[in-house]
């Protein structure tokens, strides 16, 4: 399915600022849909007059009347005359979709077309559809919602709503159903939804909201006087026609998220809307998660310290032993333990249980050169980015890469080689991480088989690749000289044995 940006690029020549404005409209129109109890479609017009639906939203507060997905559908100018008229006149119009062209589902819809103005030009038209047969007397809540929606739609037609700077704010704001308060131009509450009243009672309010000045009734409830003053300034700024504001406050042990929306028509303030949500339980869960994350990071830190202690003891024992074979085995163990310790070190500083593989590999490579048991100087390079991998598989992959590099250092070069080179080549796609460990040495021995090799390092590699990484591994000579070890690992969390 094409995105809004794709459809705008395909069918229009709108400048970047207009495209950003339409993205901002889409960022806010779930609120419009919920306030209007209506489905919304966004239409743009091609040079030949054909209308293209580029976005669609359905309400959370009412049943949808548009059962089909209309995004990408085309309509002629005569199919939706109310939309064509809105493009040409720049004014809000009303009509009916008797043939069902706009909905692609059923006829008999009441359609209101609202021009979206940006820098004085109509760049799109929003239509919101409601069923003609479902008109009835509205409740006070529905009336307050519809009045606010009407004000916002007129601001949309004037080009004063939304503000592009509010796009990020809209993604984390309270929803209409969480709690809604309507203020008049003097800052007095003219309507408060039941959820908004409950949120204020949670804050410690013992009286009703209706008829009271919201700033005066809210300030005493907030624990921090600086937060209270900041919220008061936000509300006053919105009443004066300023920008939308979002703020979280603590009151009487409750965490409350508020967003203020200025309502302005023709340059005159109509008051403000306040969306409010009780996020006390959400904050409690966030704190619990942060505590668990800190505990996990502390565990990784202690594991790293213990592994470093083990590596130090093995290194000390390697220095004291007189048996060369035992010394080499101990040094290999030091390298393996150090590799795992570096992964836990990275996890101890990560907040999302993911490891930057490039950073860990770059720290391991110098260590491998230091503990190499060959006299030939070896240069180790990394080309490309390994990227980030989840903690479950990062340790196994780091172990595999270090074993393959160590195997190349120890077995790829003969004593006459002046200098060897081992290169780690990484290429990452959406599904796969491909790693090639290349050396410019003498190539594989005659009759060598990866599956039948009795080298401990390669046995470890085979086990990790198949059992832990669900990947594939291959080794072959390179015509220009040397050997390539090719490793492919799925990036997604696939079950073992998945194709």
Curated annotation (Swiss-Prot):
Keywords: ATP-binding, Cytoplasm, Kinase, Nucleotide-binding, Phosphoprotein, Stress response, Transferase, Two-component regulatory system
Keyword Kinase: yes
Gene3D superfamilies registered for this protein in UniProt: GAF domain, Histidine kinase-like ATPase, C-terminal domain, PAS domain
Signal peptide extent: none
GO cellular component, one term: cytoplasm
Modified positions (Phosphohistidine) in chain numbering: 301
Region named GAF: 4-149
Keyword DNA-binding assigned: no
Name of protein: Sensor histidine kinase PdtaS
Organism name: Mycolicibacterium smegmatis (strain ATCC 700084 / mc(2)155) (Mycobacterium smegmatis)
């Amino acid at each position: 399915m094409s995105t809004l940006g794709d459809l705008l690029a395909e069918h229009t020549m709108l400048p970047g600022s207009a495209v950003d404005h339409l993205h901002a409209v889409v960022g806010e129109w779930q609120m419009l849909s919920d306030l209007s109890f209506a489905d919304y479609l966004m239409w743009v017009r091609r040079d030949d007059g054909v209308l293209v639906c580029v976005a669609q939203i359905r309400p959370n507060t009412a049943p949808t009347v548009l059962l089909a997905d209309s995004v990408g559908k085309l309509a002629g100018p005569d199919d939706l005359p109310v939309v064509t008229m809105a493009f040409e006149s720049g004014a809000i119009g009303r009509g009916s979709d008797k043939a069902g062209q706009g909905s692609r589902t059923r006829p008999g819809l009441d359609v209101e077309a609202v021009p979206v103005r940006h820098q004085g030009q109509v760049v799109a038209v929003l239509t919101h559809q409601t069923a003609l047969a479902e008109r009835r007397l509205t409740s006070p809540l529905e009336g307050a919602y519809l009045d606010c929606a009407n004000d916002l739609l007129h601001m949309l037609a004037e080009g004063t709503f939304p503000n592009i700077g509010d796009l990020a704010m809209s993604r984390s704001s309270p929803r209409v159903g969480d709690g809604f308060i309507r203020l008049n131009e003097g800052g007095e509450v003219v309507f408060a939804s039941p959820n908004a009243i409950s949120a204020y009672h949670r804050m410690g309010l013992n009286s009703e909201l209706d008829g009271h000045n919201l700033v005066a009734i809210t300030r005493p409830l907030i624990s921090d006087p600086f937060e209270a003053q900041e919220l008061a300034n936000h509300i006053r700024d919105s009443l004066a026609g300023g920008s939308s504001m979002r703020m979280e406050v603590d009151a009487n042990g409750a965490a409350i998220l508020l967003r203020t929306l200025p309502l302005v028509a023709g340059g005159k303030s109509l008051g403000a809307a306040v969306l409010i949500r009780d996020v006390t339980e959400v904050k409690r869960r966030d704190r619990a998660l942060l505590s668990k994350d800190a505990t996990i990071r502390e565990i990784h830190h202690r594991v790293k310290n213990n592994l470093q202690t083990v590596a130090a003891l093995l290194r000390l024992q390697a220095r004291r032993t007189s048996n060369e074979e035992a010394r080499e085995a101990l040094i290999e163990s030091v390298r393996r333990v150090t590799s795992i310790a570096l992964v836990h070190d990275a996890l101890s500083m990560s907040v999302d249980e993911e490891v930057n593989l490039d950073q860990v590999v770059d720290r391991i490579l110098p260590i491998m050169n230091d503990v190499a048991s060959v006299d030939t100087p070896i240069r180790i390079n990394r080309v490309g980015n390994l990227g980030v991998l989840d903690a479950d598989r990062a340790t196994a992959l780091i172990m595999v890469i270090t074993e393959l590099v160590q195997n190349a250092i120890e077995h790829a070069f003969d004593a006459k080689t002046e200098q060897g080179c081992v290169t780690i080549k990484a290429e990452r796609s959406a599904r796969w991480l491909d790693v090639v460990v290349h050396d410019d040495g003498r190539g594989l021995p005659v009759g060598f088989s990866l599956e039948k090799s009795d080298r401990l390092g390669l046995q470890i590699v085979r086990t990790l690749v198949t059992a832990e990484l669900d990947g594939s591994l291959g080794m072959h000579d390179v015509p220009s000289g040397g050997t390539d070890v090719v490793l492919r690992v799925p990036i997604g969390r696939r079950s073992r044995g998945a194709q």
